[in-house]
Curated annotation (Swiss-Prot):
UniProt main location, coarse: cytoplasm
Official protein name in the record: Putative pre-16S rRNA nuclease
Highest taxon of source: Bacteria
Annotated organism of origin: Polaromonas sp. (strain JS666 / ATCC BAA-500)
Subcellular location: Cytoplasm
Taxonomic lineage from the root: Bacteria, Pseudomonadati, Pseudomonadota, Betaproteobacteria, Burkholderiales
SUPFAM superfamilies according to UniProt: Ribonuclease H-like
Signal sequence extent: none
Length: 138
């Protein structure tokens, strides 16, 4: 479902924190509706509760209105194990922090980040995910 078709879901939301979830590292980016751009932040190199504590610090620092999580799919759109892991991560964020969490198809974000010469592919992927989300807003 396109966010343009349901503008009430994002009404009043201005700032976002986005995540490119990985088993060992999670890319992070910040962005806003006004500029519709994203800025990479330091990648979180932690798992489990340590990852969530690091995210909590980022949320306190940036005070986003909502979160965005990239969800990986196979090129044909089929889900796989990492799809389910990222969706679980998304649910954990929603439950733990009480913020709206939007899921974005992140196919090819890492490939695009690497092709762009990103020094931190995870953070660059989070930027790509967030900018894709921001462009989809009405």
């Amino acid at each position: 479902m396109s966010l343009a078709a349901v503008p009430h879901l994002t009404a009043g939301l201005q700032t976002f924190l986005a995540f490119d979830f990985g088993l060992q590292r999670t890319g992070v980016a910040t962005g806003n509706v006004l500029t519709r751009t994203a800025t990479p932040q330091a990648t979180i190199a932690a798992t489990g509760d340590a990852r969530l504590k690091a995210i909590e610090l980022r949320i306190r620092e940036w005070q986003p209105d909502a979160l965005v999580v990239g969800i990986p799919f196979h090129p044909d759109g089929a889900s796989h194990e990492n799809t389910r892991r990222a969706q679980k991560f998304s649910r954990q964020l929603r439950a733990r922090f009480g913020l709206k969490v939007f899921e974005v198809d992140e196919r090819y974000s890492t490939t695009e980040a690497l092709a762009g010469g990103a020094a931190d592919a995870d953070a660059a992927s989070a930027c790509i995910i967030l900018e894709q989300f921001l462009r989809s807003l009405p």
